[in-house]
Amino acid sequence: MINKIINEFSTPFYLYDENIIEEKIRFLNNLNFKFDSKFHFAVKANPNLAILNKINHHNFGAEVVSAGELFKALKSGFDPSNIIFDGPGKTEFDLKYAITQQIKSINIENLEEIDFINEYSLSKGLITNIGIRINPNIDGYTLDKITTGKTGGKFGVSFDQIDFDSISKLKGIKLSTLSEHIGSQITDHHQLIKSYQELIILADGLLKKGISIETLDF
């Protein structure tokens, strides 16, 4: 097959095996969790519109980190309610575009983003769902360049920096999500479980204060 394609098209080119993609998707969708869950595909991993369209048709959501990725997710058919916006490098344009598209959640990485999202949402007569990326101060025991859950890092917000009561009173936003990501290429699953437990404990504590979190984003 590959030789036939090489003869038909000029090289170089990317060749994707649809059967393998669908096999991986089915494996994930068949995992038996004891709670409601949904996988979100990181668009940065492959922004090819045909691939995104295929993934969208298998009940996946999309995770984006820029206005360009959000545009591609929408163009490939993802419903805004199934798109989350992550990343520490959001521009004002990114935020404005995400707000007007009314996506599932904009996960903030610093408290200044909250003020901007609230004010812009109010100016447009909208209420925007946000999440807060929590920095749980848990080491992923991976390479220094890709560990992201320790205090003092550039990713996420520490527990003690967040005034949840004040955030819950803002009229232009709704805090719906708590998010965390302590790093990549982690081989010690105990650290991952520990970080998940910290997020669950935080969500339970907020519920006791009357602040209901709808989604935990791992």
Describe the predicted segments one by one.
Residues 1-128, 170, 174, 201, ...:
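A charged N-terminal "starter" segment
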Residues 127-139:
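Glycine-rich, aromatic-flanked loop segments that form ligand/cofactor-binding clefts
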Residues 88, 133-135, 181:
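Generic beta-structure capping elements
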Residues 137-218:
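Active-site loop/helix belt of alpha/beta enzymes
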